[in-house]
């Protein structure tokens, strides 16, 4: 699991590099401004929707995140899902990710703001992981969807994608 104190390694892709750079800049900003404080919330893989459907994933173009890709395949928008790699060191050979519900993310934002407004943060800059703290493989997510809905999802195994890490999930004990 990744803790908030895990040192940054080399980013595997531009998205990861921007996340690292942002945290470094925030840390420097708040360290040098004693009257300011801030919190970074590290999302792992947001998924799901609020029951009202006011927040959640509803891509207007081709989805790239796993849950909407599964959904698009189930309803026939896509012919099939490509599972990128089946030779990772995981339970079934597919990548492992930590999925966190969007309602939990919204609640975490509310709590972070309350924490800052009540001046409860001991440090001027704090980082919190937002994840469930355990990994789910891509194939497990597909099979769970099928079991929950009774809808078969057509998938195929493809080659690994450059930059994909085998497994990443949160150590969420700090939050």
Can you annotate each of these PLM segments?
Residues 1-45, 54-65:
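Catalytic helix-loop patch of NAD(P)-dependent Rossmann-fold dehydrogenases
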Residues 26-27, 49, 116:
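Enrichment for repetitive, rod-forming helical segments
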Residues 3, 67-175:
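C-terminal substrate-binding subdomain of Rossmann-fold SDR/epimerase-dehydratase oxidoreductases
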Residues 33, 51-61, 85-97:
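Short, charged helix-to-loop "capping" segments that act as catalytic/coupling loops
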Residues 7, 48-51, 88, 135:
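Active-site proximal helix/loop that lines the substrate pocket
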Residues 46-49, 105:
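Conserved sequence/active-site signature of Rossmann-fold short-chain dehydrogenase/reductase
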Residues 50-63, 70-73, 79:
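Hydrophobic, Gly/Ser/Ala-rich alpha-helical and linker tracts in large acyl-processing enzymes
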């Amino acid at each position: 699991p990744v803790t908030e104190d895990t040192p940054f390694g080399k980013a595997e892709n531009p998205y990861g590099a921007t996340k690292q750079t942002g945290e470094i800049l925030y840390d420097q900003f708040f360290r040098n401004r004693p009257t300011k404080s801030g919190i970074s919330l590290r999302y792992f893989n947001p998924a799901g929707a609020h029951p009202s459907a006011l927040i959640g994933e509803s891509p207007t173009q081709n989805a790239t995140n796993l849950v909407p890709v599964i959904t698009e395949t189930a309803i026939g928008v896509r012919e099939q899902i490509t599972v990128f790699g089946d030779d990772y060191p995981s339970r079934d050979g597919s990548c492992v990710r930590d999925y966190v519900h969007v309602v939990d993310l919204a609640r975490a934002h509310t709590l972070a703001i309350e924490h800052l407004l009540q001046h409860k943060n001991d440090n001027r800059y704090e980082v919190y992981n937002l994840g469930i703290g355990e990994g789910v493989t891509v194939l497990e997510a597909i099979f769970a969807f099928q079991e929950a809905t009774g809808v078969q999802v057509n998938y195929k195994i493809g080659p690994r994608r450059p930059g994909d890490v085998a497994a990443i999930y949160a150590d969420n004990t700090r939050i």
